[in-house]
From Swiss-Prot:
Subunit composition and interactions: Protochlorophyllide reductase is composed of three subunits; ChlL, ChlN and ChlB. Forms a heterotetramer of two ChlB and two ChlN subunits.
One annotated GO biological process: light-independent chlorophyll biosynthetic process
Cofactor, how bound (note): Binds 1 [4Fe-4S] cluster per heterodimer. The cluster is bound at the heterodimer interface by residues from both subunits.
PANTHER family for the chain: LIGHT-INDEPENDENT PROTOCHLOROPHYLLIDE REDUCTASE SUBUNIT N (PTHR39429:SF3)
Enzymatic reactions: chlorophyllide a + oxidized 2[4Fe-4S]-[ferredoxin] + 2 ADP + 2 phosphate = protochlorophyllide a + reduced 2[4Fe-4S]-[ferredoxin] + 2 ATP + 2 H2O
Residues annotated as binding [4Fe-4S] cluster: 17, 42, 103
Entry keyword Metal-binding: yes
Cofactors: [4Fe-4S] cluster
Keyword NADP in annotation: no
Listed transmembrane segments: none
EC number(s) recorded for this UniProt protein: 1.3.7.7
Record-level Gene Ontology MF annotations: 4 iron, 4 sulfur cluster binding; ATP binding; metal ion binding; oxidoreductase activity, acting on iron-sulfur proteins as donors; oxidoreductase activity, acting on the CH-CH group of donors, iron-sulfur protein as acceptor
Protein known as: Light-independent protochlorophyllide reductase subunit N
């Protein structure tokens, strides 16, 4: 079957680590605390990414591994237990404590699973302690959420009741809107993972139909299947088309009449089309290069090409689960280069050679590329922004049209990298 050209490369990477996901997870579950076991670098990353004031009481922190810990001269397990006890004594509102591994803790083989088990025995149910890895040694930053949710799956109560389970963190307002729309479709029992309170874990079992809201939850999906749930394969809810197909997959699973689906969703699609028009005028015909970082690249590429008229130079993704992404791959134009993995130097060479109008990349690459005259969009901004659902299609398109509008105001009529070449019409 014709489709995109799937390629693979390996080499040096330029990505954030999984600790970054704590920034949105701690906001999602205000009764949870994320204790990173890592270095001062880990602490600086989380503090900077979250933008928390120094006098605030954040719901995350770092148990810093000292040189004595790293050299094996001190018992890091005893010190970790002491820090956890002091934290829980000072913050009695904590109901779930996540022990989050990092590159340093993995290098010295610190067993956080054992630490969580010891603390659970000691606390006797007063606080639930779970662990997962946020290390960036072999993963990218969004996989931190996959690790956190995968750690919760064994704790979910069992139930055979018929329900729809939305898996993946969404902005509260976006989630409320989607649940409202599912209710209008006749799907009334809708739950979420992660929940808004860490103790209100949704049940799972043979009657559970799972709809992933994010494309980077591979391990969580596998564990939910092992619990008896059915995980639907559908395009992800980015853009109007993807969001509609995503909701239609749930409607089909719950045997909702297609005519009723059309009655509910057609007016929303028309509103989205109108909202997209001013951004499509800017984006249509422009060439975009997506570097791998967030694993949102394939759904974004599909949206930008099919709904905004952009030309895909190359679509990079850190990892490609072909089964989970089958619906997205099927919607990409034939011959589109989809590159799994990264050799950052080679990819930057291809960026310079292809001279795209816009590059989606990590913060570490954005400023150097901007200095070379190449317009960029931070991929991490797409993770923090409320972009899911039909209603958000216009806002999603604006995130890409804004840097091009800004560049045209600064250099009207000029190509981003070749001043003697006109901007694509």
């Amino acid at each position: 079957m014709a489709g995109p050209t799937l390629l693979k490369e390996s080499g040096p990477r330029e990505v954030f680590c999984g600790l970054t996901s704590i920034v949105w997870l701690h906001r999602r579950m205000p009764d949870a605390f994320f204790l990173v076991v890592g270095s001062r670098t880990c602490a600086h990353l989380i503090q900077s990414a979250a933008g928390v004031m120094i006098f605030a009481e954040p719901r995350f922190g770092t148990a810093i591994l000292s040189e004595r810990d790293l050299a094996g001269l001190a018992d890091a397990h005893e010190e970790l237990d002491r820090v956890a006890r002091e934290l829980l004594q000072r913050r009695p509102e904590i109901r779930t404590l996540f022990l989050v591994g990092s590159c340093p803790s993995e290098v010295i083989k610190l067993d956080l699973a054992r630490a969580a088990e010891r603390l659970n025995d000691e606390l006797q149910g007063r606080v639930r302690v779970v662990n997962y890895s946020g290390s960036g040694i072999e993963t990218t930053f969004t996989q931190g959420e996959d690790g956190a949710l995968a750690a919760l799956v064994p704790l979910l109560p069992s139930s055979a009741e018929r329900q729809l389970l939305l898996v993946g963190t969404l902005a509260d307002a976006v989630e409320d809107r989607l649940i409202h729309l599912f209710g209008r479709l006749g799907i009334d029992r809708v739950r979420s993972l992660p929940p808004r309170q860490s103790t209100a874990l949704p049940p799972v079992g043979p009657g559970t139909t799972v709809l992933l809201t994010q494309p980077f939850l591979t391990d969580t999906a596998r564990l939910l299947r092992n619990r008896g749930a059915t995980v639907l394969t559908a395009p992800f809810p980015l853009g109007a088309e993807g969001s509609r197909r995503w909701m239609e997959a749930a409607a089909q699973a719950f045997e909702v009449a297609p005519s009723h689906v059309a009655t509910v969703l057609d007016p929303l699609m028309e509103r989205a089309r109108i909202a997209l028009e001013p951004h499509r005028e800017v984006l249509a015909g422009k060439r975009i290069f997506l570097l791998p970082e967030s694993q949102l690249e394939l759904p974004l590429a599909r949206f930008l090409q099919r709904e905004c008229g952009m030309e895909l130079v190359e679509v990079g993704t850190p990892y490609l689960n072909r089964e989970q992404m089958a619906e997205e791959l099927a919607l990409l134009p034939e011959g589109t280069p989809v590159m799994e993995g990264q050799h950052v130097e080679l990819q930057l060479d291809r960026v310079r050679d292809s001279a795209p109008d816009l590059v989606v990349c990590g913060m570490g690459l954005a400023n150097p590329l901007e200095a070379e005259g190449i317009a960029t969009k931070w991929s991490i901004e797409l993770v923090f922004s409320p972009i899911h659902g039909i209603d958000q299609a216009g806002d999603l398109a604006e995130l890409f049209s804004r840097p091009l509008r800004r560049r045209q105001l600064i250099h009207p009529g000029l190509h981003p990298t070749q001043p003697d070449q006109p901007v694509h019409a």
